[in-house]
Amino acid sequence: SMNDAEKAHWRSVGYFFRAYKYFKMLSLYGDLPWVEHTLSEDSEELYLPRDPRDVVAQNILNNLKYAEEHIKVDGDGNNTINRAVVQSLISRFCLFEGTWRKYHALPNATTYLEECTRASKEVMNKYTTLHPNYEELFNSESLAGINGIILYKEYATSQLCHGLTRMVRTGESQIEATKDAVDSYLCSDGHPIKNSTTYGGDKDVYAQFRNRDY
């Protein structure tokens, strides 16, 4: 049997995933029903009206703050949900919700933005060193042990793989970066391409990638 601390930890893991799913739905639909227990095909809650955005957003934040307080600092082992993972989701959710409220003239924007700032500082203080090779964050067979990686998807032969090689074997890849995405990267001097004296120009891709911060 589990003691109270272990129960609170696993409840926190459940709250994390519920908050993650609700965050995705909130960004799509705004108002939606908030459900706190398992439903069956006969549950009357399937026909509930939508709850206001304020209620859903506050419940998401409440779940995440409970998880932050009660989850094991290092999770249940390597690459599991731990306190830093929860704080990262608090940061991302509150940045989204706070800016949405700010630019749509909704109340309580500052509350979410301040939570974003607080949680972000906690994560930054824990991960003080980042991996120096940006490309390896996307091309490595495993992200285990790489500085700055908070949570990653781990692949295993015959268990969990992906179809990346199939998608990039043709002349026209389905997942190439757009020109806007490439242009959004700063130059090595910290300035955007329009303000940098180190930008190589648009003559070819080699010039575009020269002296960029990646």
Named regions from a protein language model:
Residues L32, L61-E68, T80-Y214:
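An aromatic- and glycine-enriched ligand-binding surface/loop that stacks and positions planar moieties
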Residues S1-R83, C94-T111:
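Aromatic-anchored glycine-rich loop motif in surface-exposed flexible loops
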